[in-house]
Structure formats: structure tokens, C-alpha cells
Amino acid sequence: MKQLFGKFACLMLLVMACCVVAPVSAMAGTGVDNFKITSGIDTRKSSEITFDATRVISGTAEKGAKIGITVYEPYTVNGKTYYKLIRTYNITVGSTGIFSQSISLKEGANYLVVAARKDGKYSEIRTTINRKDKVLKSVLSQSIA
């Protein structure tokens, strides 16, 4: 049992070490009123890990605000990080002040920017969601069982 726990602990440390750390940040000051992510991104964390191919991001903002959710793939060349555009999702907030959008995640690092715009005001939240492959999920579930 101790040996199994030791293997599981080592595997979990490896998973955490593989995470790309990109802090969740929010632009404040002249921001869009009531802009807040309510689910799909944990704004208290700098990055998250998932095995899921999709994620639903929901939040609030003032009526008429334009929400853009952009997914980038980070990559490094000669020590400098660049971001390749993967996909952009656009939503207009309705009278309820609530928005929700399902997004696709590729395996590996997915750098997300969720931005709100209205009447010259701008707010954004940035984070990284790391999607792990099914092989790792299988190994973890076998270690736990």
C-alpha cells in the first residue's frame, strides 16, 4: 500500500511540475460594470488542469457588453514565449446580465483571455488551462483503484 501511495504521490508531483504558470489577471479601473467569471475558470488560481475536451465559461457583465473568449497555444522560440491563435468565441450579454459559452480545449496548454467591452470600457481575465491526455488519466485511475 505504501509503495502504491508513493507512486501516486510521485505522479501527482510530475503532473503539477508540468503545469504552465500564467497568472490569472484582471484589468481594473475603467472596467466593464459587473464583469465577473462565475464558473469555468477559477480566478483564484494561476492555472488549472483538466482531462476534459471542453469547458463552459460563464459570468456576468452589464447588458450589451461584448464578451470575447480567445484561446491561444503558447510556444517558445529561443527562450521567448509566443501565442498562436487557436479560436475566438464572441457573445453579447443579454438583459439578464449573464453569459455562458462552451469552448474547446486542445491537449496541452490553452492560454485563455476572456475580455469584456462596452462604451469604451474594457476588462479582461487571463489564465492557462492545461488539458492532459487520456493515457495519464488512465494511469491515475489505475493508481487510485
Each predicted region: which residue ranges?
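Hydrophobic helical h-region of N-terminal Sec-dependent signal peptides
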Residues: 9-18
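Classical N-terminal targeting signals for secretion and organelle import
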Residues: 1-3, 15-16
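C-terminal segment of classical bacterial N-terminal signal peptides
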Residues: 18-25
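Ser/Thr-rich low-complexity repeats and stalk/linker segments
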Residues: 2-10, 26-145
